[in-house]
């Protein structure tokens, strides 16, 4: 609940409680919050309102140290005795005691995931994404789909017309007059992927080709999935350029399961997980894929939807200490190669070159799954 009369107090940025905090621990301390100062430079008096009570409850469930919570509250302008009493009463409250029961169940589930992850990491070359050719249907299903392992297939596009025809200039010459949907102005929004509907724009494909090829490396614009390009009759020749598929894919379902990607070097798809399995083929250019096991979900701070706030390139370990020790699989997918994304694997993708890609979900296995996603916006 938000404060009724004053702004919600600043949320603490968690940091490890001690240098020897173990991986998987939920012990956090809040960092110092910025005080509101009056004209004399002293902390302005705040009321202990509903926003503060929720803040105390949140941090009790995070196992923050009471002294650390008290210091933050006093620095923000709360009376020390009132703040100390609020912390004490919260730890004894029936609501928090009930929440502790569910917390125990959650922590048991997290421990099961953590122990299973330890077993997975015993596999030789766990952190290496294999590059394979000649993978049979049976091996793909058992080793990679059901076995839940990413893999790069190097021979899928061997007979694809797209490999000799597609280029940005080809798109401009044959389809440049058509309008397509892109994502734009992404650089001004740290949550551009979560807010992707707000970044949709319609542009002429020819103009977008010029922008991509002439604008240098950037993440500001990108034609991403769900643009429906390959479902439109005008773009049927592109769909026909996708040649034979592996025998673990249903060719007849391709048209309704394929997405087209086109963007410059420098694009970044933030850390998230998909809700089904897919294949992603590079036709032009290269992309760098980083993968994190779905068993590591408790350690990537998935507070909202399918997204993680962690940037693998620059992880803020003071704010997200549980990410320390998470193993990241790293592979560059070259033109002509196809990466398999197993169910629920976290991934962050970076464009290394101007690239044209297609992704498709018509895998000949059950590929419709349900996730109960959190919708917490105030952590």
What residues fall within each predicted segment?
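N-terminal accessory scaffold of Fe(II)-dependent oxygenases
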Residues: 2-17, 23-27, 31, 81, ...
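Eukaryotic low-complexity, mixed-charge intrinsically disordered interaction/regulatory segments enriched
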Residues: 24-92
